[in-house]
């Protein structure tokens, strides 16, 4: 088991790149701590924003992802001059301060819980964001499960290769467009001030405690559930 830690402060920007599965948990600390049992190695370091390049993970000759890393522009904040970058060739776990802002890339699965900043996540297979404050951008090649407090943008699009479960707790005024295995449907919550497009290779489940109104031309609604009682 390889382990590394670095002093990061209470609200760091952390970029995590893993060749396989990655689990991320928020905790009460000013350290970013990572561990992996894989043979692909582990690196953790502070980098200037001008140094951050491509996120690339591969298994053999098969490239899982190869994308340019653009640092997110956090609302009300300047782009940080330094970021913490964690890289591992295989699977592992990363602990980050509760207030972290994250960009996470993984060749297979991503599981993030208990983060009070913004999270952007790109998974080759499954993606799960639970008890996250702010949802940025997200995509997955397989199943996606989202449970966040708010979103960073007013117009968003999320795509999953399989089932997509979507719950944003403060979504009280939005126009929802969904395309999944059952076809296309459109609905409105409140005054429809935000725009949310959900595209899935499986079934989409919209989780909300708000009234959902079906819209023309078909006045069809898909799968809608109320959140579980806390």
Descriptions of predicted regions:
Residues 1-230:
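Intrinsically disordered, low-complexity terminal regions
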